[in-house]
Amino acid sequence: MWRWVRQQLGFDPPHQSDTRTIYIANRFPQNGLYTPQKFIDNRIISSKYTIWNFVPKNLFEQFRRVANFYFLIIFLVQLMIDTPTSPITSGLPLFFVITVTAIKQGYEDWLRHNSDNEVNGAPVYVVRSGGLVKTRSKNIRVGDIVRIAKDEIFPADLVLLSSDRLDGSCHVTTASLDGETNLKTHVSVPETAVLQTVANLDSLIAVIECQQPEADLYRFMGRMIITQQMEEIVRPLGPESLLLRGARLKNTKEIFGVAVYTGMETKMALNYKSKSQKRSAVEKSMNTFLIIYLIILISEAIISTILKYTWQAEEKWDEPWYNQKTEHQRNSSKILRFISDFLAFLVLYNFIIPISLYVTVEMQKFLGSFFIGWDLDLYHEESDQKAQVNTSDLNEELGQVEYVFTDKTGTLTENEMQFRECSINGLKYQEINGKLVPEGPSPDSTEGEVPFLGSLSHLSNSAHLTATSLRTSPESETELIKEHDLFFKAVSLCHTVQISNVQTDGIGDGPWQPNLAPAQLEYYASSPDEKALVEAAARAGIIFVGISEETMEVKVLGRLERYKLLHILEFDSDRRRMSVIVQAPSGEKLLFAKGAESSILPKCIGGEIAKTRIHVDEFALKGLRTLCIAYRQFTAKEYEDVDRRLFEARTALQHREEKLADAFQYIEKDLILLGATAVEDRLQDKVRETIEALRMAGIKVWVLTGDKHETAVSVSLSCGHFHRTMNILELINQKSDSGCAEQLRQLARRITEDHVIQHGLVVDGTSLSLALREHEKLFMEVCRNCSAVLCCRMAPLQKAKVIRLIKISPEKPITLAVGDGANDVSMIQEAHVGIGIMGKEGRQAARNSDYAIARFKFLSKLLFVHGHFYYIRIATLVQYFFYKNVCFITPQFLYQFYCLFSQQTLYDSVYLTLYNICFTSLPVLIYSLVEQHIDPHVLQSKPTLYRDISKNGLLSIKAFLYWTVLGFSHAFIFFFGSYFLVGKDTSLLGNGQMFGNWTFGTLVFTVMVITVTVKMALETHFWTWINHLVTWGSIIFYFIFSLFYGGILWPFLGSQNMYFVFIQLLSSGSAWFAILLMVVTCLFIDVVKKVFDRQLHPTSTEKAQLAEAHSSVKCLDSVCCFPGETPCASVGRMLERVIGRCSPNHISRLWNASDPFYTNDRSILTLSPMDSSTC
């Protein structure tokens, strides 16, 4: 029993095997010794709550937040002891915040419940008792055989058993899982591929042993043990056999598969897990400010308590006769009384901590994140992709970036490969005018044309491809033809490219038809490099036709050749190569390999290695992507050994990856080099301009790529990452720690000696590993003094290590990583902000990123406009919230000096409750959503303005102290201005009476509401109709509410303290004079400071505002005038000169496609930038 309890609490989890055993069709052994493993059902549960646990679970989650818990404690203190304010003052705002959050989360969870019910209730067909049974998806059990028809979604993770194809293969699309739109081929084992009917499957006796569930979509290890005629046949299972839940069946009429993972154990469900939480610099500053204000709160409570007891200790200040202490008070413990009074003062001043700050910030981030997706400037028309926001918690972090780390291929480049050149057996060729010719002839010359290769007209444009007629040639030319033949055969066979049969109705069904003309073939591949190379081979006359029953078919000069595909040695980032083993028509066993020259050339023992290496370097200097091609021929005995090793590695359930790596290492050796290929990956549009803009903004750009040194440097120069005038330093080919350290010291000396010029650093993966191992500080010193850094030959984890090294450096800079492929996920998740490019290498980077965009050039708009605006908005929001709460509570503290620390409240309880909820909340919320202190086009055209907000400047201690001191000074003016103007002089009132406590407090509260609201108006640079509505509407609402609240006797209120108070206040001319005088006095200080700052020490942003205001139409007229009216033109000119701001002119309701930035109907909610013709 105790162990069960510990297991339920998670302290003693039950032992779980590393593998699971699945009996197909749930045919368990009948010997009675087998205990079936327990598996979960196939229900998907994405919801968090049930109808029974919603209230307690949601409350628990909300009160884990420090601010909510703090106000809960204050509320409980008010209930337990005699406090000066009603528990409603803390309880109602807390109830409002908790209720709004609970409703939002409850509604979202209700939507998740509906979605779950729809998915779990979907109809499926399962093979049971020799027939097909219709059931619901949630009823599928592990071991069930499921039938899926064309275009249906797989309801669980299935191991493919058979399909309507003879070879048992099928095509699926995983676009909903990883975003990859290309079709993927999945295969079944030969023994089950022939079982294409329900009756045949009912006779299958087989067991699957596989790993326990894991989230990696591309990793699966298992084996199938089939019993046939009392013999057991073992077949390996890999990712190519697993059909993932959420994927869709394509190009296949139907398949049968056995469920191996169900419900929340499917890979799709395991990927629901959220990424590690990232916290922005603004959030960290906000938490710091909360701690400071908590210290201020406790200090005020302690000071008030001490002063109270100090006063009571003096005999002359004893309690008056009408307020004598009770017997209980005189006999109670002084310590308990001190604690009680301290808690009472704590309750009295607790509103200095803004309860609504968290809710307002959440709403601002949530609503503000939509603007990125609505921005047409971030929409890519060709791919029909708009910007995506995967997390709204980091919007303001986009305005604080100091380092950008970017991948190259697919991020800076288009990832659209075009075959350009190749090297075959030491001879270099290039494509000129559709012909592959040796290097040297002019474009119009045909002399020297390769006799075997012929026309290079594009595959998609030719109805039929024929090679040029072979010329009569001597033996040397015949040998040359054979070498070229073998080279392009290797290119046509060593790949994972697939073919769809182009028909009038789209993708055809059925097996491949090798007699199709090339124009009827369409290649598609997950790697653009492979597609480009296979198409180039086809243009050269060696056409890959397709795969039929594990046979690769190639047309050579119109003659069909069949190669039996024996093994595929898949590509991985560690080996940086892939290989295939095929059996040629002649019966020879051949291995064809292709990969990076650093992984292929060391494995070669023959061929023109030296010449090819030179050609590869020449290709790289042109910025071309290179691959080397090699082959190996096996004897019968060698192949038996290779086949045995691969079988043992692939059927292993433990350490399969390590065993496969060892097997690949053993097999891929003693290669004969055939040549190398060079494909061009052109730069994306406006990459150079974007990188230059980032540099002007003070952001350092690092390029992290897996390409070789020469290719990476060439691309860095072409994209403007490196300048021609820049001094390029290199840390490459380091073999030892000592050599690496010495090279780093030399680089540091060179930078010190040539400190005037800019430096760029190139470092390769091997040298980087040595530098990070023992010489981090020295390496960082060199990097910090370089304007641009290029890291080549990088492994995915090395990219993440580099970013982490920068993150933990003493300066703690904000980092941003941008990439497009699965190998970029680690660095995207490591950086403070991760940007995924929705490119051609799937959607893994976009799915794991914080933001996703279609092109690198959109990064400038994302940072310089959205990031700038978001940071300005939320930084002002945070500072303003603390400012207005200091204004709110400080008069309460000052009032205690005049009421002898009796804990008498200055404000009415209703005003205490509604101050942050109703009277002052909307103006700052709208400001934080639509404020544009400068035109977006100016921000993009002047990247240097980005420097003004760097280093979290608006939330620095200096800025925090300014807002805090401003709040205290305004509070002193509120209190003492009211006290000296109307609080002491009875002649100011017509009836000869002094203001009472509630009238005095209401006067202070009225001045405060008006002042903090107009203060928000002074901070606003971009006025829309909704700004006017909430700003002036908040003040009007306060007056209407106060008249309504104080003008009626409310029967349900315990006291009528405010009855007729506000009406009496407004009836006094001296009160109106005091309100106007105090508001002007408070804001005059702020206006004077702004004027002097702009005249004496203007920032770059303020200079741009002034320049923009002078060059624009006087747009302040729109605040108070209709078009054509000019009563306020002179006021507008004066204010524009002083503070350099404007508001949009009268705007038509007609939307224009040329309108910049957002596409909203601007007459409803103007979220667009200030029109350049107006401001």
From Swiss-Prot:
Enzymatic class: translocase
InterPro entries: ATPase_P-typ_cyto_dom_N, ATPase_P-typ_P_site, ATPase_P-typ_TM_dom_sf, ATPase_P-typ_transduc_dom_A_sf, HAD-like_sf, HAD_sf, P-type_ATPase_IV, P-type_ATPase_N
Single GO MF annotation: magnesium ion binding
Single biological process term from Gene Ontology: phospholipid transport
Ranges that cross the membrane: 69-89, 91-111, 287-307, 338-358, 862-882, 910-930, 963-983, 994-1014, 1033-1053, 1060-1080
UniProt xrefs under Gene3D superfamilies: Calcium-transporting ATPase, cytoplasmic domain N, Calcium-transporting ATPase, cytoplasmic transduction domain A, HAD superfamily/HAD-like
Methyltransferase keyword on record: no
Active site as annotated: 407 (4-aspartylphosphate intermediate)
Residues engaged in binding Mg(2+): 407, 409, 820, 824
Major localisation: membrane
Binding positions for ATP per the UniProt entry: 407-409, 530, 571, 594, 625, 705-707, 793, 799, 823-824
Superkingdom in the source lineage: Eukaryota
Record keyword Membrane present: yes
Cofactor: Mg(2+)
Topology term for the membrane: Multi-pass membrane protein
UniProt keyword annotations, A-Z: ATP-binding, Endoplasmic reticulum, Endosome, Golgi apparatus, Lipid transport, Magnesium, Membrane, Metal-binding, Nucleotide-binding, Translocase, Transmembrane, Transmembrane helix, Transport
GO annotation, cellular component aspect: early endosome membrane; endoplasmic reticulum; Golgi apparatus; phospholipid-translocating ATPase complex; recycling endosome membrane
EC number annotated for this UniProt entry: 7.6.2.1
Localization per Swiss-Prot or TrEMBL: Recycling endosome membrane; Early endosome; Endoplasmic reticulum; Golgi apparatus, trans-Golgi network
Tissue spec: Expressed in retina, brain, liver, testes and kidney (at protein level).
Catalysed reactions, semicolon-separated: ATP + H2O + phospholipidSide 1 = ADP + phosphate + phospholipidSide 2; a 1,2-diacyl-sn-glycero-3-phospho-L-serine(out) + ATP + H2O = a 1,2-diacyl-sn-glycero-3-phospho-L-serine(in) + ADP + phosphate + H(+); a 1,2-diacyl-sn-glycero-3-phosphoethanolamine(out) + ATP + H2O = a 1,2-diacyl-sn-glycero-3-phosphoethanolamine(in) + ADP + phosphate + H(+)
Subunit-structure text: Component of a P4-ATPase flippase complex which consists of a catalytic alpha subunit ATP11B and an accessory beta subunit TMEM30A.
Family: Belongs to the cation transport ATPase (P-type) (TC 3.A.3) family. Type IV subfamily.
Function of the molecule: Catalytic component of a P4-ATPase flippase complex which catalyzes the hydrolysis of ATP coupled to the transport of aminophospholipids, phosphatidylserines (PS) and phosphatidylethanolamines (PE), from the outer to the inner leaflet of intracellular membranes. May contribute to the maintenance of membrane lipid asymmetry in endosome compartment.
UniProt protein name: Phospholipid-transporting ATPase IF
Organism (species): Mus musculus
